[in-house]
Regions:
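Electropositive polyanion-binding surfaces
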Residues: 1-241
Length: 241
């Protein structure tokens, strides 16, 4: 689980990305840790969810719930209006979420809420910089399928381009970029993710391309590479990830 914070620092923004510290609740090598290792990930299906961690942890103690104090790992960075990162700090923290919004609620407040407006502006600028640096933007329909107890099936097309979804996506990408640069700078052992250039480009930059072009562009992407050092990630347009 994760949360965002933002403060004004003159013309710049002090942005915080706070990630729930699961290790504070799960003992290394303990029964829960071993079972989570065996499962590897949570599985989401139209009619059920198989969690990696027990529900009481995943949706309780390990979740950043409004009004509850939770241990976390926080990534703070100062960003200019041009999305340049001036400094960063990664630190253990204790957080209490003030507002818990879903995407629809965040979208409805995107224009009127000062904090959301500031985060959205930073996210948009960072997105444009990534595209200018060669990032590949794949925009395909995102379907949500749910099967209810009575057998009814609900299919929804999610708006992947909504302001709130773009905000969260870009903040997570920015936080991972900052973390990768921090780990590389400190020469700390880590697993980095990179990607070679695609085999071809059907569209570029701010051009979103047609639905067919997006499907074909995805087929032209190179495989992601996991390594022990930072390398260029062409899909994201970043020098480290």
């Amino acid at each position: 689980d994760d949360a965002l914070s933002v403060e004004s620092r003159g013309r710049n923004l002090r942005i915080g990305v706070h990630i729930s510290d699961v290790a504070a609740w799960v003992e290394k090598g303990g029964a829960i840790d071993q079972e989570a290792l065996a499962r590897g990930t949570s599985i989401y299906m139209p009619d059920r969810k198989i969690p990696m961690l027990p529900t009481g942890l995943a949706e309780g103690l390990c979740s950043l719930v409004r009004g509850e104090v939770r241990p976390a790992v926080s990534i703070f960075f100062t960003a200019t209006p041009q999305a340049d990162i001036l400094d960063w700090e990664i630190t253990p923290s204790v957080v209490s979420v003030k507002r818990q919004l879903n995407y629809s609620e965040a979208d409805s407040l995107a224009e009127s809420d000062k904090s959301l407006r500031a985060l959205a502006a930073a996210a948009g600028t960072f997105n444009r910089r990534r595209l200018e640096n060669g990032a590949v933007q794949i925009l395909l329909p995102d379907l949500s399928v749910r099967v209810y107890n009575g057998g009814d099936i609900q299919v929804k097309i999610m708006d992947r381009d909504s302001p709130a979804r773009l905000l969260v996506s870009e903040m997570m990408i920015m936080a991972n970029w900052v973390m990768a640069r921090f780990l590389a700078q400190k020469n700390m052992p880590a697993v980095f993710r990179s990607q070679l250039h695609p085999r071809g480009r059907l569209y570029s930059g701010q051009d979103e391309g047609t639905l067919f072009q997006n499907w074909m562009q995805r087929r032209m992407l190179s495989r992601a590479i996991l390594g022990t050092g930072p390398e260029y990630h062409s899909g994201l347009g970043l020098d480290a990830y």
